């Protein structure tokens, strides 16, 4: 296994990991059941907003939300639209407590532009989302940005509808050390 970079406290530097590596940690051990329960509660809370496609992955330990980029940005723009606030605000609670969640922002595009354009666009859009969270009181110390460009389509890029589905933001809420520690101390249910 490759050696993982650590910060000055000895914690793994999540910014140096691939998305797949981030999605595979932490090993929850005995706390898995409590974490799954907490993630189910968080999913139910987010479902009330009815603004994104939600699912639990990795044995129900990681919450994945998918938001349409058209709800966040104007076409080919990197500035958040006025209505983006409606879609992003429900996720602020996940960023209130530092290291409660490791949040992965994965921005996708369709394949209508060049590879370089798509990567630049998705990078700028993901940064705009992270900056919005910061401006609105979220702690973004444990937020990692991934620009996916057009590399991971979920629909055919041959149709308008397919391209619209491919332009999306995936938000992954991965249990952080604070959440695991709270589960260990029996404080997660409070």
In which residue ranges do the predicted regions lie?
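Short, well-ordered turn and helix-capping elements at secondary-structure junctions
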Residues: 69-71, 77, 149, 158
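Periplasmic OmpA-like peptidoglycan-binding domain that tethers envelope proteins to the cell wall
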Residues: 108-187
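Periplasmic peptidoglycan-binding/anchoring modules of Gram-negative envelope and division proteins
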Residues: 39-58, 73-107, 134, 171, ...
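Soluble periplasmic/extracytoplasmic beta-strand elements of cell-envelope proteins
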Residues: 55-57, 62-68, 72, 102-106, ...
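Second-shell loop/turn segments in exported
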Residues: 28-33, 72-81, 115-119
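N-terminal targeting leaders that direct proteins to extracytoplasmic destinations
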Residues: 1-59, 179
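A broad, low-specificity signal for short, low-complexity segments enriched in glycine/proline
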Residues: 16-17, 24-34, 63-67, 104-106, ...
